[in-house]
Structures are given as structure tokens and as C-alpha cells.
Amino acid sequence: MKKNLAKATALLLTAGMLGGTGITAAASDVELNPGGTYPVVKDGTLEFDCFTMSMPNVEDLQTNDFTKYMEEKTGIKMNFLTGGRDDWSDKLNLMLQSNDYPDVILGVSPDLAKYGVKEGMIIPLDDYLTEENVPNYLKMMEPYGLDMTKEADGKIYSLADINVCYHCQYGRKMWVNKRYLDEMGIDVPTTTDEFYDACKKFLEYKPNGVAIGGAAQGWYSRMQDWLIDAFVLMPNTSYTTSQKDTIALNTDTNEIECVATDDRYKEAMKWIKSLYDLGAIYDGDFTQTGEQLKTLVNQADEPVLFFTAGTISDMIDATSNPDFYKDYECMAPIAGPDGTRIAFQTPNPGVNSGAFCITDKCENPEAALRWIDFFYSEIGDLCSQYGADEGTDWVLNPEGKVGLNGEPAKYEVLNLYSAETQNHDWQDIGIRVAPADYRLGQAVDPDVDVHSTAGLEKLLYDASAELYAPYAGTSNIKLFDEMKLTDEESTNISVIAVEVADIIESDSVAFMTGAKDIDSEWDSFKDSLDKAGLQDLIAVYQEAYARSSEGDETEATTEAAAETEAATEAAETTAETETETAA
């Protein structure tokens, strides 16, 4: 396939007609404008089927103002197929397995080792990643390098999502209704004992209340993960297998282990069961969706004391319910029995492959890439997040304003984020293109009320810096970013990882609720994991970890050699200059 294709044949089998031309796409060559210019399509309209994740605060992607803006700007229309936050993965996998899948996949990551490397349904993009097609993307990726997006076969099957979000690193947060604590005359808990006592007193104060709210799905909504951290660092869903297999590195032994088989995990289960026996844990915490948790939190009688969420705005809207929003504060991790306070910190720097993929159904990859490249431009993220009307939705370089980092602000958001349903922008749908200087460059009034819509970023930044960052890195459990597996490795553990995660989830819930006695069933639990193939899963992780460690050492050696060579050249140049000067 040619790298710099200015003219491409687009056989749009499901699309019908080019917009307004009366010419079928299947019978016409579609001419593209030069790279980096808009519209992408010189005449008419290209159509692609696009799968992405929908969100409840966006009414209809197809009729959304930003969607229309992109159609007018690029000459490309996306026909959206969507899955919700809780079921997108199942829907996408079903599409891929049934051979009825879209041209492009946006904002959600399929199994690239399976559907890309092995089966070829998702195509390699290496030959298309040129200045002609993706100038903004290449510039944005310069600090990180394209190598990080390569799969085990050395090819690139996706573009990256860049969201170097400080508060997202500490997304596992607990929120507490401070008004209730004040009315009960108690402080924010700092230990497991104090947390238990707060729950007990709350249930006496509000007998029909829910002391701890959580959800099975949602952005950091699993309450048990936050509670387990008081005993041992609980891994998040694996970046490698997309399963909650709890695999991590024990830095004391430099060996891969399953945290769910650690004795500290067992003690965490016992403590959480004591909370369940107290009546502090709502049964729905283990099964409900994030939306159902939101409904629970927002009931008229305000029944919830504690709830887990990556951001309070996922649960309470500051605009429509400002007083209730102000009742809640973020609280720091609590200390476990040994006195250790552990804060979860994601191992991922905020740059992830899998954000935009093109399938072999797509007849014009160049056009699809030029469409997505806008998102990597200076204003792409602003337009998708907040709307495309400069001066109304946002402004660049606002005079006299400072960012979260205290430096001159790069932009100011005028159309603030809202949890209420709207149809002007995409907000969190699609991809984020937000490097650190961009995130920290958002204009913030230093005196802003952090309990207002305008103060959300500062609220999350301050909570992360003051309450969570001090307790990060205090555990001997080290979490992994994505490990690149070979196709064989991925195939060998794909079923194992699911079975291991299912056993951990089902048995852990049984332990926490008392359906199973953890003391009598602990050995049986570990045996069932081994029978499911846990040791094979650990072995694959260990091998991948060894490969990544070798790669890090090679990279470090290469960088050192390059620095030495540069220093030598500089010294030689200096010597030559001194010789010429002396002459």
C-alpha cells in the first residue's frame, strides 16, 4: 500500500451515495486533499462505520453538534455503532467473532494480539503513519515514541490515547459525606478501626442508610478494591489480559505473584466481611453498574455515607445539585492493621495503544487516519471535549489566567463539563489527547470554589496531590503497564485469564459476604486457581516481564552509548576549534 496516497478508491459497500453528488462511492474514485488540509475529501462525502463506547451524558452521537462539525470539516461521515460503559467489550467481541464488524474502532481497545496479529481483521498501520496522513499524531507522539504502540510482532495496529492526567493516576478514591460526619461528631477515618466505627455509628444515626456504596462496573467504582488497599495493594484490571487476574510483581522476591493468594488479601477479606456483617455494605455493591450506584447516591434521602469513584462528578452533578455536591469530600487511604497506608497509583503513564484501529473492512485507511488526526491537533481535544465553538466553548491563551501548575494558562474552558445529558460535545467519548502540559495548562481561578463545576479539576488535582500521592509506592507490590505478549502466549492464556479472574471474583464475593468461610475454604480457593491454570498464567507474565526488563536494559545501554558518542563528537569538535584558534 502506498504511503502518500492523494487519491484513493473508496468502495463503500454499505454507504449508498456520495453526499450531494448523486454518484455512488463504488463507482467513483474519491480524491483526497493534500495531507494536513481540510476537508479531507475533495468532493462529496465518505462514510465509515465506527464502533465506540457511548456515555449517558451524551444524548445521541449521530446528531451531536461535534459529530456534525467533524462531518463538515472533513467530508467524512461516521455511522456510529455503540456499546455502553458496561457492555461495550461484549458487543465488540461479538461483532468481531461474527465477521460483521465496522471499518474503524474508536476509543476502546480490542484484543490486538488476537484480532490484529493473529487474525488480521485489524490491519497494521505502519505504512500509513506518514506526515501526509497523520502529521499531528506524529508530532504528539515524539516525546513517547511509536515503539510503545508496537505489538509482539513488531507492528503497529492502533493509534495511542494520550491522557497524562495527574488525578487519573490516583483514580481509586473514596468520597465521604462530611456533613454526616459532622452531625455525628466524628472525624474522617484514618484507620480500618475508625472506618468500621464510622460505619457503625452511621447505621445507628441513619438505620436505612447505606454506609458504603460501590459498583461492579464504573470508573474506579469497586469499593472493595479501595478497602483491600488497607492490607495489600490491589491490582486493577490487567492492561495485558483485560481481566481482573490480580497479577503483579513482588519486589521483595522479584517474582510474579497473584495478589489474591497473598495472606494479606485473606485478612482483607475477613475485615470486609466484618463490615458486611455490620450491615455497612449494600448487596448491590457487588453487582450494580456505575449508573445504578449514581441513582442510589442521588436518592432524595441521601442514603450513602461513603462511595468510591474516580471523580465525584460521575456520581453527583454540581450544577443541578450544588448543595449535595458540597456535602462530599475526598478522603485519604486508611491505614491497615500494620499501620501502612497504601494508595493505588496506575503504572501507566497515560499513553495507551488501542485508541483507534482500522479493520480490513475499511477501503480507505488514509482517509480514516486523516479524520482521526484532527483529534491530535492543538484544538482537537478541546473541540471533542467541550464543543467546537472557539470563544463560546473555550479560548486559547487567556490573558492573565494561570493553569493548575501555576504557569500561564494555555486555554480556558467556558462550556464546563456536566454529568447531565447534552448533545453539544462528546465529553469523555472517543479518545483523549491531553499531554501533561495541556492538562495542567487549563485556566483555573486560584480562589475557585473547588466544590463547584468550575473547580472540579482543581478539586481532583488537590485531592490527588495531598491525600493520595504521599502514600503511593509504599507497597512491595508493583503493578504492570501493558506487557506485549506473543500471539502464542496470548492464545495460551486467553481462556486461563478469564477463568482465573472469574474464580477470584466469585470466591472473593463469597468470602466477603460469608457465603463461604475463608478459613476453611482458603486452601480450596488456591487449589481451584491452580487447576484453572494460574501457574501457567504466572509463567507467561514472568517471561514477558523478563523480555521487557531486557528491553529496558538494552534501551538504557543504547542511550548511554549515544550519549557517549555525542560527548566524544562534542569533545572532538571543541578540540578542532581550539586547534584552529591556536593556528
Could you describe each region identified by the protein language model?
Residues M53, I379-S506:
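Conserved small-residue motifs centered on glycine
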Residues N33-G36, D87-L94, S109-P110, E142-G145, ...:
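Short alpha-helical segments and helix-capping/turn motifs at coil-helix boundaries
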Residues L11-G20:
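Bacterial N-terminal signal peptides
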Residues A8-A10, I23-E194, S238-I247, T251, ...:
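Conserved N-terminal structural module of periplasmic/extracytoplasmic solute-binding proteins
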Residues G44-F48, T74-N79, N99-D103, G120-I123, ...:
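Loop/turn elements at helix/coil->beta-strand transitions in domains of secreted/extracellular proteins
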Residues Y220-T246, K273-G441:
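Extracytoplasmic/periplasmic substrate-binding proteins
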Residues D126, D153-W226, L249-Q299, F356-D393, ...:
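Helix-loop-helix "hinge/cap" segment bordering the ligand-binding cleft or interdomain interface
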Residues M1-T9:
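Bacterial N-terminal signal peptides that target proteins for export
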